[in-house]
Regions:
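Core nucleic-acid recognition elements
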Residues: 1-328, 336-342, 352-356, 368, ...
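Short catalytic-loop micro-motif centered on adjacent basic/acidic residues
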Residues: 346-349, 399
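A short, contiguous, amphipathic alpha-helix enriched in charged residues
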Residues: 364-376
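Short amphipathic beta-strand starts and helix->beta connectors
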Residues: 374-387
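Short, solvent-exposed beta-strand edge segments and adjacent coil->beta transition regions
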Residues: 395-397
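Short amphipathic alpha-helices within nucleic acid-binding modules
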Residues: 406-412
Length: 478
């Protein structure tokens, strides 16, 4: 039959992408009442306490700050929204672990003893580990990189990182868990000069999947959280080529309100690179070019660090959960490891909590300064404001420092692997976190204030005598 047959092709109507226009940075007036400071923090999802807001206000009252800002045409006594958002991400509980670092007045009611604990982290985690490091030769890198590094053999180092992704998994079980596992994969990739992720692990704690009681509005049923989290971890690992080698699941009523989602990755790196450098030591220098490679920046993941530092409520924004793309990350991973072995990388870290504000801000501590151009950052869509570009946690991005002599070779390698790359900053020695958008300066923060200016939290704790009850195991019949 040679007669023509018509084929009906269904037509799909796709929504048009909204065309947002770029908005100039706003000035945030902090010379207001305490109540207004709290309102600014809460409505902006900044997760800053009143004391922290007051500390920021005091910074902008200093004459030396006025003088430094004058030459950059910045408001002298008030932060821009870019600066305030950057401080909020850097000072968030998610990034600073302020509870672990708090000064705690402790009262043991059982013995009557009172004591002061100046940072649980420093006294009960850092000090024992540092004491151990003095006695062994296999603890190579602790407490200052994306993961800890130990010597595994004469030729290989091993690194392990585990972190939680609880709030994102409560709002979007699939997306929250996927970005949790691919994010911790990037932590391994961003350790030292780059490690290869070889295995994933996880522990999940959910409410009972057969729960039949009431649930608050906008809270997913535990069975949906279970299936979504499991699928997100599985897909994130499989599409990145990294197997999940073990895990555990716990069910308990305590996890109905918020699940506990641990995602972990194991990585390996050669002890020495072909050029003789030790793989666990970053070597940036003034003038190095800072690239953002991999994915683009979008509206997803904005306020991820601050929202996860707050109590989960019905108003918690789902936009704080990032959108994962493991295949893009796989291409980037292969390219980074090849660049490492070719000697192109001087420093590397991932774009996780806080986005570029965190990654470049942390790397800048090595040289004591940086200058960022947000206008050079590739975007998923137009119209993002300066502060949104700086703190967005859009996934599949690494920040990589390269010596200017290796610029062409690095870019050719990225093109070969089809990995997008853009020079977004340079390292300086000014002591400043200097952010521009094109020719205009939109943020100017001293690095020491950005990283060490957060006031120490003060807490009280009590220990009461425990009353143990006899445990009667259920019978086999029960």
């Amino acid at each position: 039959d040679t007669r023509r047959r018509s084929v009906l092709i269904p037509q799909l109507d796709f929504p048009e992408r909204p065309n947002y226009e770029y908005q100039q940075p706003n000035v945030v007036d902090l010379e207001v009442s305490d109540e207004e400071l709290i309102r600014i923090s809460e409505e902006g999802i900044l997760a800053l306490s009143l004391l922290e807001m007051q500390t920021i206000r005091e910074h902008y009252r200093k004459p030396e700050v006025h003088e430094a800002r004058k030459s950059f045409n910045l408001p002298q006594m008030s932060p821009t929204d870019v600066e305030l958002e950057c401080l909020a991400q850097t000072w968030s509980e998610h990034c600073k672990h302020k509870i672990f670092a708090a000064k705690i007045e402790h009262h043991d009611k059982e013995t009557g003893e009172k004591s002061t604990i100046d940072s649980l982290f420093k006294t009960h985690i850092m000090k024992p580990t540092e004491d151990m490091q003095e006695e062994v030769n296999w603890l190579l890198s602790i407490f200052h990189d994306n993961s800890g590094v130990i010597s595994w053999s004469d030729n290989l180092n091993l690194c392990i990182k585990v972190e939680t992704h609880n709030s994102p998994s409560a709002l979007d079980p699939y997306g929250g868990a996927m970005t949790g596992i691919v994010g911790v994969n990037r932590d391994i990739l961003g350790t030292g000069l780059g490690a290869r992720p070889i295995a994933n692990t996880d522990v999940f704690c959910f409410g009972p999947p057969n729960w039949q009681g009431n649930l608050p509005e906008n809270l997913f049923h535990p069975s949906r959280v279970l299936s979504g989290v499991h699928a997100g971890i599985r897909v994130g690992g499989n599409e990145s080529g990294i197997p999940t080698v073990n895990g555990a699941i716990v069910f308990d009523d305590r996890f109905i309100g918020k699940p506990l989602v641990y995602a972990g990755t194991v990585g390996i790196m050669p002890r020495l690179l072909p050029d003789g450098r030790e793989s666990h030591i970053k070597t940036p220098a003034e003038g190095d070019l800072v690239y953002m490679i991999g994915g683009r920046v979008g509206y997803d993941g904005i306020h991820g660090a601050t929202f996860s530092s707050l109590e989960l409520t019905e108003e918690s924004p789902s936009s704080a959960v990032q959108i994962g793309d493991p295949i893009t990350q796989k291409k980037m991973l292969d390219m980074v490891l090849e660049a490492r072995d070719l000697g192109y990388i001087t420093c590397i870290t991932d774009n996780g909590a806080g986005g570029l504000s965190s990654s470049i801000g942390e790397m800048a501590e090595y040289t004591n300064g940086c200058e960022i151009d947000l206008g050079a950052v590739p975007l998923k869509q137009s119209g993002l404001s300066s502060w949104e570009i700086l703190i967005s946690e859009s996934q599949e991005r690494m920040t990589v420092a390269v010596h200017p002599d290796d610029q062409n070779a690095f870019e050719e390698l990225a093109d070969l692997h089809e990995v997008e790359h853009s020079i977004v900053a340079r390292f300086t020695t000014t002591g400043l976190f200097h952010v521009k958008h094109g020719e205009s300066t939109v943020a100017l923060l001293p690095l020491n204030f950005l990283h060490d200016g957060v006031p120490q939290l003060e807490l009280e704790s009590e220990w009461e005598e425990t009353k143990l009850e006899q445990f009667i195991p259920p019978s086999a019949v029960d």
